[in-house]
Curated annotation (Swiss-Prot):
An MF annotation (GO) of this entry: phosphatase activity
Name of the protein described by the UniProt record: HMP-PP phosphatase
Residue numbers binding Mg(2+): 8, 10, 212
Enzyme Commission number, as recorded: 3.6.1.-
Protein transport as UniProt keyword: no
Function: Catalyzes the hydrolysis of 4-amino-2-methyl-5-hydroxymethylpyrimidine pyrophosphate (HMP-PP) to 4-amino-2-methyl-5-hydroxymethylpyrimidine phosphate (HMP-P).
Cofactor(s) for this UniProt protein: Mg(2+)
HAMAP family: HMP_PP_phosphat
Residues of the active site: 8 (nucleophile)
Catalyzed reaction equations: 4-amino-2-methyl-5-(diphosphooxymethyl)pyrimidine + H2O = 4-amino-2-methyl-5-(phosphooxymethyl)pyrimidine + phosphate + H(+)
Domain of life where this protein originates: Bacteria
Gene: cof
Gene source species: Shigella flexneri
Organismal lineage: Bacteria, Pseudomonadati, Pseudomonadota, Gammaproteobacteria, Enterobacterales
This protein's UniProt keywords: Hydrolase, Magnesium, Metal-binding
Family: Belongs to the HAD-like hydrolase superfamily. Cof family.
Length: 272
């Protein structure tokens, strides 16, 4: 039986309205009763996730910023990974041929150069929001990641530009169809989960994980039991064709699967 379960948030554990469903909360409580370690592995900021865990009285480890930070149950920082200052400078100062908005993250929060009110709908659950700044005055030595949000085709073209400019100096991935992220080299949820399991004396084979986007690829591919959401990005399914696909996040599919796993561990599962 798995001893640790890792969850992506958006498109996986959260429903389309960006809330946690009651069935999901009940299932998380059942996992803790079985002494199964919970880990939330998300692109969201540590400050936001710590607020959510506190509001829900949930005990869980945190992998945030798509692996740039790992925190213990008590909020202790166990691992950090930042963009090199020269990479952050290039991405922030270059004039990219894109309509996408740019968003910068460090330990103090989420920063952007102009209002993007539509993006705040994603954070309605927590109330987390950006701070407007002059991007050119952003401290370069503490940037965890930089995101571009916009149309997928536009972001795909931007990805090519970024690859040409950065080469092997950064890791690029789509955390959603409308969000392209620039991360430190080697930084992903799978690498962060390895840090997490080593700290607990566990093997990745002891872990189960759920996800829906390309930023979940390394995590899902490295654990003993990885599951892809029915609403997942097609690219993720293509990258990991051997992994089982469960239902849609709108139906709290993670809870549906885990309830079956807890109650009928020896019977085959159907997402219907």
């Amino acid at each position: 039986m798995a001893r640790l379960v890792a969850f992506d948030m958006d498109g996986t554990l959260l429903m389309p309205d960006h809330h946690l469903g009651e069935k999901t909360l009940s299932t998380l409580a059942r996992l803790r009763e079985r002494d199964i370690t919970l880990t939330f592995a998300t692109g969201r900021h540590a400050l936001e996730m710590q607020h959510i865990l506190g509001a829900l009285s949930l005990d869980a480890y945190l992998i945030t910023g798509n692996g740039t930070r790992v925190h213990s149950l008590e909020g202790e920082l166990l691992h950090r990974d930042d963009l090199p200052a020269d990479v952050a400078e290039l991405v922030l100062y270059q004039q990219w041929d894109t309509r996408a908005s740019m968003h910068i993250f460090n330990d103090d929060g989420w920063f952007t150069g102009k209002e993007s009110p539509a993006l705040l709908q994603v954070f309605v659950y927590s109330g987390f929001r950006y701070q407007i700044i002059d991007v050119k005055k952003m401290p370069l030595g503490s940037v965890t990641k930089i995101c571009f949000c916009g149309d997928h085709d536009d972001l795909t073209r931007l990805q090519i530009q970024l690859y040409e400019a950065l080469g092997e100096r950064a890791h690029l991935c789509f955390s959603a169809t409308d969000c392209l992220e620039v991360l430190p080299v080697g930084c992903n949820k799978g690498a962060a989960l390895t840090v997490r399991t080593q700290h607990l004396g566990l093997s990745l084979r002891d872990c189960m994980a759920f996800g829906d986007a390309m930023n979940d690829r390394e995590m899902l591919g490295s654990v003993g039991s990885g599951f892809i959401m029915g609403n997942a990005m097609p690219q993720l399914r293509a990258e990991l064709p051997h992994l089982p696909v469960i239902g849609h996040c709108r139906n709290q599919a993670v809870s549906h699967y885990l309830t079956h796993w807890l109650d009928y561990p020896h019977l085959p599962y159907s997402p219907e």
